[in-house]
Amino acid sequence: MSDTNPPEFMRFVPPDAQQLARAIATHSERHAQVLRGGDALALVDASADLAGLLTQAGQQAHALAVLAPHQAPADALSAHEPAAWFWCAYATALQYLGRRDEAEPVFAKAVAVARAGAWRRIEAMALHHWGRSLVEQDRVHEARDRFNQALALREALGEPSQASSRRALAALAAL
């Protein structure tokens, strides 16, 4: 992999672009309503949801613009699960903007917030996404560790997404 512009490792590609566009429109409207309402927790949640969809659509710069103004509330609300989703979305947007060094501590924050709240589903997702970012930096050993942690959590939860972690580990073995 190139150090200057590493390829994306197993990036999720939504199967239905039109459905994704509709979801973005719906969540954009929800985000605007929540922004006007002033509920900080609802805003952190709505920002994370919208940013995740934007990143899926390849609009990670827009995702980061949605998230950036709400970092302080996300920090203040770290005792609530949406904060963990917020930091995972933020780190993933940074990752796909090629700002992986900046994403690293944000992935760590997402995992720490999820662990503190015992929110295993988002912990597994953040670990899995972090693993992909590490592969993109040729840090395969660390990536394998994150994928194994994600897989263990997903297996314990009976999550269908455990198949994604298994595929990532198999792809790593082929590198």
Role assignments for model-derived ranges:
Residues 45, 85, 125, 145, ...:
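Residue register of alpha-helical TPR repeats
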